[in-house]
Amino acid sequence: MVAHPDDETLWAGGFVLEHSEWDWFIGTLCRASDLDRAPKFARVLECLHACGGMLDMDDGPEQRPLPALDVQRQVLRLLPGSHFDRLLTHGPQGEYTWHRRHREVCQAVVALWRAGRISADALWLFAYEDGERQYLPRAVRNAHVKHSLPPEVWRTKFDLMTQVYGFHPESWEARTTPRTEAFWCFESRGQLDKWWRERGLAV
């Protein structure tokens, strides 16, 4: 569950590609009416052998805060079922400095999973940081899971970003495309709450 079409590829595309036999659903909360990005997202879903859906929450440049309950309602509206083996979404600080929608989607998914309104055996949060804009986003050093992508998998992911989504090879998005993917991983609410508190985040 991501904020924007391309987030799924940028932050977890290698993982999806390496588990293409899984029954993937990819949802994005923004850009359903974007005549450029929406059809590209549909093509990426085909390349990833995934199902998916889009909604059209506000994503204007002002990045006005969205009511937390509204974001949660949209997440539930988009999800196709009641139970999932693994749920992937943004990290609590986003993946770079900084995008409000990434944080809001994380907060919504975490709140729903913690409350039992989304059932999933495991919750994985993207684990990337950019040193407060000191460098391109990269895997957090002590993330629970870090996986260096085989060259051919990374190339496929890079091609999705540049040839399907259409980002220039020298764009921020293309240069960011991680060769190592990383996640914070939780199998219980207790694990998540402990980790959340240790980082000074509001539970």
Where is each model-derived feature located?
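The feature marks non-catalytic terminal segments
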Residues: 86, 119-203
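Active-site adenylate/phosphate-handling loop in enzymes that bind or generate adenylated species
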Residues: 80-124
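Active-site environment of divalent metal-dependent phosphoester hydrolases
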Residues: 7-10, 33-36, 92-98, 131-133
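Short aromatic-enriched loop/helix-cap "lid" or pocket-rim segments at secondary-structure transitions
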Residues: 12-13, 37-39, 100-101, 134-140
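Internal, well-ordered alpha-helical segments in soluble enzyme and binding-protein domains
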Residues: 37, 71, 104-109, 153, ...
